[in-house]
Structures are given as structure tokens and as C-alpha cells.
């Protein structure tokens, strides 16, 4: 099912293209009035600013009520041009109309607070199209769309995308990384070093670019022969709007989880599901996830032979970073780490916390012997009192190396995710020698998890089962030989072993997308 305004075909011929570009240029100043929402307040809310088309800068003020008639006229007469500029969902117009209708009756509230502006942006931010200009005669480039390239956001999933595509760059594919949701860090020089670190490639590859597409008033120039790569469902939706304007009608889609399940039955779930039916070549992280997509028969995965045409690789766990450390375990107190992300419902934060409280009530974590910690969140979580003097203290995310050192101090891990994907934290904890309580889901069965590592203790995602798993993990804390043996995971030992076998297939896909 397609959601939003139907795609218009790209104009045929230079004359038609010039006419449309002229219409867009003439309309931008008027459209700036329609979208004059305060950019710096949106940035404070950490959401993409709605930019002034005429200057490329965030607009400075919300339009006063005197502009309502003009705005209404622009909405009525500017839709065709808007579609050429944004190719945006119908919800865009409905929200803008609702914005002006509400502000007309509550102008004081809207002019003095960010409530309304943020509400509009919250509804649109995940499907806000990139502002691109397509030019002919440019060398083909692989454009990798990532939500963020900020240092604090480069964790497991984004790092896998960077690792994979940087290896393509090292094999001669020009690569441009586009951050769709965030500006780059003020000092983005670390990115080249980060790419070398996550890929294990010592030399810096020259033909690599980093740009931000967050400011939609700033035009991004793409070549007509470029190929796009989506790394999350909303980046695939952005690609859907650009693809008809490129020569290639197919894009690369790196799928690392079943993202529709991250949302209730909703617009976002519908949009995420829709991406599996687009014209893409799949790159799938993990056979578990590939099997789940095939079993659910979503989108193109119901087509005979489609799964076989995808490139599927198993995630690696870096043994240089994630391995047991004797000195970290030779301490007075044992440690439990809970991968706690309250902002991510699929990580079952509440279920895990209730289970920990019940396990503590059964005497699992005597305060004189155990320390408990939250990990996985960017922000510091409040200390949780489980009763009986048992506290869970927060370890906010700092960087990847600090995260690895922290895992090496764990005796027990609790890492839940209601997904067919294993996720990285349970594997990384297990590789560091911890006994990890993690949940099963669909094709992610107990047998398949235990085949990866005996340090994984799979349970059903029920409170009583998680409690039983925690009690068993605590009993195993002193069994160091068994824990060290379980640290040898049945996954690729490094990213060379994980990705090198599938790179030839991905290069074939790259060439096929370019019509070669």
C-alpha cells in the first residue's frame, strides 16, 4: 500500500525540466512564508528545522494572524509546486492547514510557545523528504543515508552500515554519507578515523564524503547515475521520493531489524512496512532476520527467489574489544549490567525492571556482594531502588571503547529485545564472559541462541521466566571456566570474516543498480 501523494514521473527533456525549475524558483519566497517556523527553537527540541527556502536558513518567526488569508491561498495554489519541491505526503498539507486554523483561534499560545510548531514537526519529521537537485554528467556515487553521523550515535547498527559501505569505498566505489536527521558534529574530522577503526582498514580512502541533509532548505546535489542506500525505514521512504528522478530505479536497502514492529499499528508502521515492497536489492544482517522476513512474507519477500537474491551476512563481534578480562573480574563485588533503553519499547525496559525487582526480593543480589548498573542510554537514568538496599545506578553512554571496557566487568547481563534479531549487546556481553539473560522471539529460538554461545541464557519474554533466568545466571557467576568457554561465540570472529564473503555479491548489486 502506498501512503501519501503519488510519485510524479521526472520531467522529460531539458525544456520541461527548466520550466519546472523556474516555477520552483519563483515560488520559493512565497513558500517561505508558509513554512516560516522558528528554526532555532526546533533545533532546541532536536528536530529538523523547517527552513526558509529563499535563504537556506531557518526562518525567524511564526507568521502572525494577518498572513492567514495569504497562507490559505498559497496552500490552494501552491500544491503542484510543493509536490515538485518536496514530493511530500498529503499529511503535510493537512498539518499546515491545521496549524494555521489553530493559530488563528489561539494566536497568543502559538506565537509564544513551541507547542504547535513542535507538534507539526513531530508528525512530519520521519517522512520529511530531502531537498535534492539531480544533475547529469556526474560520476556515479553510492549515497548512504544514515539518520546521524554524530559521534554519540555511532553504535552497533550505524557502525555496521559504515563498516560495510567503507569496504565498498576501499574497493573503488565512491561513497557519500548523508546524515538525514542531524547536523554533523562541529568537528567531524574524527569520522575518517572512526571508519578506519570500525572497518579495520588502515588507510584512509579518499573518495568518501560526509554531508548533512538535516536542513531541508539546503539543496543536496546528486548525480543522475547515483545509487542510493537506505539504512532505516524512513531513509528508504526518502529514497522513494528521489528514485524516480534517477536513472536507476532500484536502491540498496540494508535491513538490520524488522522495523515495523517498533511501532503500534499506526502511520509509522504502515510506512515502515511499505518499504519492503519498494524496488530494492536487500542486504540483510543475520540469517535469523532473513528467515523471519521470509516467514512473514512481507513486501517483496513473498516473491519466489527474492530472499536468495539478497546478500545476507552474520554480524561479527570484535574479539579485540569484546573478550574476558581477568583483572576486571578480580574485584570484590560482582556486577550485573541491564541494557536499559526506556525510549525503545522493543527493549522491554519495564519487563526487565520488574523482573530485577522480583529477583532482588528473592535475595539474588545482596548489596554487599553485587553492584547493578543501567547501560545503553545516552542520558543518565535515575537510580532505581529495587528494595532491600539493592540499587541500579546509571552508566550513560560515552563512547564505544568505554562501553566495551564496561561489559568486560560484567558477571551477569540482562539484554532484552522483542525482535527476530539477536541485537549486538547480548552477543557482546557473552563474548566478554558474562552470562546473559535474553529473550526468544519467533525464529529466534532458544536452540538457535544457545548454538551461538552457552553464555546466552534464553527465556520467554515473561516476568517469571526472566526472573528464573536471572537466578540461574547468578548461580553461574562463580563458574569462570564455563563462562570463558562460552565467550567463544559461533559468529564470525571479525568483520573481515563476516563481510568479505558477501562483498562480491554487493558489488554485483551496485553494478546492477547502475545498469551494468
Regions found by a protein language model. Give the residues of each.
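Active-site proximal beta-strand in glycosyltransferases
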Residues: 229, 244-261, 276, 283
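Short hydrophobic beta-strand element within catalytic cores of glycosyltransferases
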Residues: 435-441
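Membrane-proximal helix-turn-helix segments that form the acceptor-binding/catalytic region
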Residues: 217-224, 266-284
Amino acid at each position: 500500500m502506498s501512503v501519501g501523494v503519488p510519485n510524479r514521473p521526472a520531467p522529460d527533456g531539458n525544456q520541461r525540466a527548466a520550466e519546472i525549475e523556474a516555477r520552483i524558483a519563483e515560488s520559493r519566497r512565497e513558500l517561505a512564508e508558509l513554512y516560516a517556523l522558528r528554526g532555532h527553537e526546533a533545533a532546541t527540541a532536536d528536530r529538523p528545522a523547517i527552513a526558509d527556502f529563499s535563504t537556506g536558513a531557518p526562518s525567524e518567526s511564526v507568521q502572525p494572524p494577518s498572513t492567514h488569508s495569504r497562507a490559505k491561498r498559497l496552500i490552494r495554489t501552491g500544491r503542484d509546486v510543493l509536490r515538485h519541491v518536496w514530493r511530500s505526503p498529503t499529511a503535510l498539507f493537512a498539518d499546515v492547514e491545521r496549524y494555521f486554523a489553530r493559530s488563528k483561534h489561539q494566536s497568543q499560545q502559538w506565537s509564544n510557545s513551541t507547542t504547535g510548531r513542535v507538534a507539526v514537526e513531530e508528525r512530519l519529521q520521519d517522512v520529511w523528504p530531502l531537498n535534492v537537485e539531480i544533475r547529469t554528467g556526474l560520476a556515479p556515487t553510492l549515497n548512504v543515508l544514515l539518520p546521524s553521523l554524530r559521534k554519540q550515535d555511532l553504535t552497533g547498527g550505524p557502525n555496521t552500515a559504515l563498516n560495510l559501505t567503507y569496504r565498498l569505498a576501499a574497493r573503488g566505489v565512491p561513497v557519500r554519507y548523508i546524515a538525514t536527521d542531524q547536523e554533523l558534529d562541529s568537528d567531524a574530522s574524527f569520522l575518517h578515523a572512526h571508519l578506519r577503526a570500525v572497518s579495520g582498514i588502515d588507510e584512509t580512502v579518499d573518495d568518501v564524503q560526509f554531508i548533512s541533509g538535516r536542513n531541508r532548505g539546503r539543496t543536496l546535489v546528486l548525480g543522475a547515475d547515483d545509487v542510493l542506500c537506505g539504512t532505516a525505514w524512513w531513509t528508504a521512504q526518502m529514497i522513494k521520493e528521489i528514485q524516480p528522478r534517477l536513472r536507476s530505479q532500484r536502491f540498496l536497502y540494508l535491513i538490520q531489524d524488522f522495523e515495523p514492529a517498533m511501532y503500534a499499528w499506526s502511520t509509522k508502521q504502515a510506512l515502515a512496512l511499505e518499504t519492503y515492497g519498494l524496488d530494492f536489492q536487500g542486504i540483510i544482517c543475520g540469517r535469523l532476520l532473513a528467515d523471519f522476513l521470509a516467514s512473514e512474507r512481507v513486501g517483496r519477500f513473498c516473491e519466489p527467489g527474492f530472499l536468495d537474491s539478497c546478500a545476507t551476512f552474520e554480524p561479527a563481534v570484535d574479539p579485540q574489544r569484546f573478550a574476558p578480562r581477568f583483572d576486571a573480574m578480580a574485584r570484590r563485588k560482582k556486577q550485573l549490567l541491564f541494557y536499559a533503553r526506556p525510549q525503545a519499547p522493543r527493549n522491554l525496559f519495564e519487563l526487565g525492571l520488574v523482573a530485577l525487582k522480583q529477583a532482588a526480593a528473592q535475595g539474588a543480589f545482596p548489596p554487599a556482594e553485587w553492584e547493578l548498573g543501567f547501560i545503553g542510554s545516552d542520558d543518565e537514568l535515575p537510580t532505581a531502588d529495587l528494595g532491600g538496599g539493592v540499587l541500579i545506578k546509571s552508566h550513560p553512554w560515552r563512547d564505544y571503547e568505554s562501553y566495551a571496557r564496561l561489559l568486560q566487568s560484567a558477571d551477569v547481563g540482562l539484554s532484552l529485545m522483542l525482535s527476530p534479531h539477536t541485537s549486538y549487546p547480548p552477543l557482546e556481553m557473552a563474548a566478554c564472559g558474562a552470562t546473559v539473560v535474553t529473550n526468544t522471539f519467533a525464529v529466534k529460538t532458544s536452540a538457535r541462541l544457545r548454538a551461538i554461545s552457552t553464555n546466552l541464557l534464553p527465556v520467554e519474554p515473561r516476568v517469571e521466566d526472566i526472573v528464573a533466568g536471572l537466578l540461574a545466571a547468578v548461580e553461574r557467576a562463580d563458574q569462570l571456566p564455563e563462562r570463558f568457554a562460552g565467550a567463544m561465540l559461533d559468529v564470525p570472529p571479525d568483520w573481515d570474516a563476516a563481510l568479505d564473503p558477501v562483498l562480491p555479491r554487493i558489488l554485483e548489486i551496485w553494478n546492477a543498480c547502475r545498469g551494468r
